[in-house]
Amino acid sequence: MMKRQFEDVTRIVIKIGTSSLVLPTGKINLEKIDQLAFVISSLMNKGKEVILVSSGAMGFGLDILKMEKRPTNLAKQQAVSSVGQVAMMSLYSQIFAHYQTNVSQILLTRDVVVFPESLANVTNAFESLISFGIVPIVNENDAVSVDEMDHATKFGDNDRLSAVVAGITKADLLIMLSDIDGLFDKNPTIYEDAQLRSHVAVITQEIIASAGGAGSKFGTGGMLSKIQSAQMVFENKGQMVLMNGANPRDILRVLEGQPLGTWFKQIEEVRHD
């Protein structure tokens, strides 16, 4: 059996999706955010370096503007996200302050990491914030990102963004929180005998083909984007855990080596019992 070894992990990127932050009613899950802030603050107190990639701007914006569903018009989507981003960061700042942890905001577009000069600048910004003991909270800059073919500003979703951030910050581990328990051998919502994959060492075509489907009603990322993110992590010689974000305290259990979720780590680097 493959044993998870995280004793040497210092820098961690945690990605939380909209479905983990927003209740099915559309209201903000305050308890979940408080638990997440507690866990991250606890890790910081233990000497870990944590970067949070947080979706949720659209969900927060819909709640504030009392809109029941995501608008289809691009300009309105950007407006809703812009309103929601301010509210989300305000709440994060308040809740993290309760645990005496300071946070900052970094909004990225894909062109920032494509061009060497801007990539160097944002990398230096991450390093400076981390050196100050601050938790950078990262999101895509939805108010200016566009999804057209002649533009290079949009990542696509925050699953991919979290993999990019893990790469440019040379993180030891990416923990992706979602509304699913991990990667299954088949769709668990359709097949009762679906089995959770505890460890994935290679992203095969079979895995890619089985990872169909879109994201939640408030978010954009589905299983395919998570698999693509894991592939990006592999290309950077990193590792990732995909796990259910229902209880953020499970992050601490994962770091203790407990086999929760799916661990993505290339086979040549895996240590055996």
UniProtKB/Swiss-Prot annotation:
- A Pfam family: AA_kinase
Main localization of the protein described in the UniProt heading: cytoplasm
Binding annotation for ATP: 15, 178-179, 220-226
Q: What class of enzyme is it?
A: transferase
Q: Which GO terms fall under molecular function for this chain's record? A: ATP binding; glutamate 5-kinase activity
Ordered alphabetically, the record's keywords are: Amino-acid biosynthesis, ATP-binding, Cytoplasm, Kinase, Nucleotide-binding, Proline biosynthesis, Transferase
What is the name listed in the Swiss-Prot or TrEMBL entry for this protein?
Answer: Glutamate 5-kinase
Q: Which gene encodes it?
A: proB
